[in-house]
């Protein structure tokens, strides 16, 4: 981690008031912490857009396990990408519906592709990809 640098910014009063409310809601100790998090989030998002950076993501799926062959298709996709899918959690939500959370690691474009494949399987009721960084380059 490098040396901490102080700098000033000019900001509209109304925008600052809204930002201060956000800081309170999220529990930040000060504006600096909130601004650092915003900068980090922007840098992480840029890496996802590039597609070649190593990222980690979670793919969350909700589906009815009674749908014919659906569980088998999802398992087949997971085995196809066993090098990238590093963990899986399966939860029975009720007598019919299951929640599956998969941790996927790889290049951003690969993680997105795997998520799209899984979410696109016929019978998946809801799916969502949440990507983050490996943290290696953030300070």
Curated annotation (Swiss-Prot):
GO terms for biological process: response to nickel cation. Transmembrane segments: none annotated. Disulfide bonds: none annotated. Binds 1 nickel ion per subunit. Ni(2+) binds at residues 79, 90, 92, 98. InterPro entries: Acetolactate_synth/TF_NikR_C, ACT-like_dom_sf, Arc_rbn_hlx_hlx, CopG, CopG/NikR_regulator, Ni_resp_reg_NikR, Ribbon_hlx_hlx, TF_NikR_Ni-bd_C. Keywords: DNA-binding, Metal-binding, Nickel, Transcription, Transcription regulation. Its cofactor is Ni(2+). GO terms for molecular function: DNA binding; DNA-binding transcription factor activity; nickel cation binding. Transcriptional regulator. Belongs to the transcriptional regulatory CopG/NikR family. HAMAP family: NikR (MF_00476). PANTHER family: NICKEL-RESPONSIVE REGULATOR. This is Putative nickel-responsive regulator. It comes from Geotalea uraniireducens (strain Rf4) (Geobacter uraniireducens).
């Amino acid at each position: 981690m490098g040396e901490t640098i102080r700098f000033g910014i000019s900001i509209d009063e109304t925008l600052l008031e809204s930002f201060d409310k956000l800081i309170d809601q999220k529990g930040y100790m000060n504006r600096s912490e909130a601004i650092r998090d915003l900068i980090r989030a922007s840098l992480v998002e840029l890496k996802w857009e590039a597609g070649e950076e190593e990222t980690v993501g979670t793919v969350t799926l909700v589906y009815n396990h009674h749908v014919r062959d659906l569980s088998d298709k999802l398992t087949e996709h997971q085995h196809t990408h066993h090098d990238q899918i590093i963990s899986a959690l399966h939860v029975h939500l009720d007598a019919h519906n299951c929640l599956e959370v998969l941790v996927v690691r790889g290049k951003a474009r690969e993680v997105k592709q795997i998520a799209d494949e899984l979410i696109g399987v016929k019978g998946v009721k809801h799916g969502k990809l949440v990507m983050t960084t490996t943290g290696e380059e953030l300070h």
